[in-house]
Amino acid sequence: MFEVVPFDIEIGQYKVMLNIADARAMGLNPGDRVRVRTRGASLTAILDVTGQMIGQGQVGIFTEAFRDLKEAKSVEISPAPRPASISYIKMLMDRQKLSEDQIRSIVRDIVYNNLSEIELSAYITASYIHNLDPQETEWLTRAMIETGERIYFDKHPVVDKHSIGGVPGNKVSMLVVPIVAASGLLIPKTSSRAITGAGGTADLMEVLAPVEFTADEIKEITETVGGVIAWGGATNIAPADDRLIKAEYALAIDPYSQMLASIMAKKGAVGADAVVVDMPTGPGTKLETPEKARVLAKDLTDLGERLGIRVECAMTFGGSPVGRTVGPALEVREALKMLETGEGPNSLREKSLALAGILLEMGGVAARGEGYRAAEEILVSGKAHRKLMEIVEAQGGDPKIRSEDIQIGEHQKQILSPTNGYVVAFYNKRIIEIARAAGAPGDKRAGVIIHKKMGEIVKKGEPLLTICSSTDWELECAVKMCSMRDALEQPPIVVEGMLLERYPTERYPRTI
């Protein structure tokens, strides 16, 4: 038996640490697997060794393993074999087709933390270089669904929405969910937090209400009020996806077949019958051309058909932010204002009604081609606002909150136009970087207000942006980013007059 020394450090996998003398006595090396047992619990962990941190007869156990070992005081340790899934990952590297059982084995080992970070990286890299075929992608999706919690609804149809992302200010779920729920359809929207953006849908909803719920609670709220906006990471829905996303982010790659499976596994796990996929398209987005978007749309609809889920994809304009705000509180205030009045930025209104309308048609509430009008009626009548307040209350928020009640960062700075002219370029990536420098999404009150968008007339000295932050130093960092100029960076907004350049360039040109 080894005395347990808990390490209060989360590392995303099961890992233990032995004194080097104990490891040598057992014939173990760093990176080997060991079976760790205590009364009522056991798991397989990756071994690390030390000469000083842990004494002989002791074992250091990191947070994830310590928690699942029921915070045991002592444990037994023995050598464990390598998972068979490692050989299947090598098969993928060698371009060999995998069977359904082999794919299920890989996913199971990902879920149960049986793969080291290096082995997981090898799987992701192999998937990136050698895409899975449609059959393998279906098996991967089903395995991701089956290894986590699932929600089964008694009432149908159940509809859902997903966005490919890449566009700042894409707050449309804050309108789509209440519009669809107000129509009588069920929409259990599980969403992500921002990883590289200025605010995911879960970050936005958290301005109004808690977003961390179990799968059973998501089902209960959805069946009670028609919809929910929850953080998927708080559930055990498609748990393999969370670990894969973290590794993909570290490697800065996004394997295509893995992306397809990730999208559809989450939707299949919540019991969706129909899904609309928002596909922002244009320069600076993940789908820069309509051709790329159409390929993805076909693959998603084909995968949905294999899984028994009806999928429709909507290619949307992604060349500039949706609405005129970026950052959680600012975006929620803008969305809530539109729900209260039915009016607001055209890009936000049009996109929200278009996506909601597609879901109303897919759910049988509206005839083909009539969904937009039906969604607009729900918005203008105030039904969508009332439904969002029901959802907010069901999730533990204040149902009486108004848009003007939402606080934004008190430290603010306007970025002014240097000249008369028109907005001729708008760089989404730079807007996101500025909002993050101001503190978003961690600081819910931080972000950017956009005063001028593509094609709009602007006079010298008029505000282009207002940056909001809760601290002076973050505001200063964000303001500095607006004026950065080098070969690799673009300003967030480019303003040009009608005269772009004069030639020849002499100070006193010749006269006739």
Swiss-Prot record:
Q: What is the species of this protein?
A: Methanothrix thermoacetophila (strain DSM 6194 / JCM 14653 / NBRC 101360 / PT)
Q: What is this protein called?
A: AMP phosphorylase
Q: Which reaction does it catalyse?
A: AMP + phosphate = alpha-D-ribose 1,5-bisphosphate + adenine; CMP + phosphate = cytosine + alpha-D-ribose 1,5-bisphosphate; UMP + phosphate = alpha-D-ribose 1,5-bisphosphate + uracil
Hey, which family's this protein in? Belongs to the thymidine/pyrimidine-nucleoside phosphorylase family. Type 2 subfamily.
Question: Is Transferase found in the keyword set?
Answer: yes
Enzyme class, UniProt record, top EC level: transferase
Describe the function of this protein.
Catalyzes the conversion of AMP and phosphate to adenine and ribose 1,5-bisphosphate (R15P). Exhibits phosphorylase activity toward CMP and UMP in addition to AMP. Functions in an archaeal AMP degradation pathway, together with R15P isomerase and RubisCO.
Q: What is the lineage of its organism?
A: Archaea, Methanobacteriati, Methanobacteriota, Stenosarchaea group, Methanomicrobia
Q: Which GO terms describe its biological process?
A: AMP catabolic process; pyrimidine deoxyribonucleoside metabolic process; pyrimidine nucleobase metabolic process
Q: What is its EC number?
A: 2.4.2.57
Q: Which GO terms describe its molecular function?
A: 1,4-alpha-oligoglucan phosphorylase activity; AMP binding; pentosyltransferase activity
Read off the CDD domains from this record. Answer: MopB_CT
Keyword Glycosyltransferase carried by entry: yes
Q: Its domain of life?
A: Archaea
Keywords from UniProt, A to Z, are: Glycosyltransferase, Transferase
Residues annotated for AMP binding in this entry: G166, S192, R193, A194, I195, T196, G197, T201, S262, K286
Q: Which residues act catalytically here?
A: D254 (proton donor)
A single GO CC term for this protein reads: cytosol
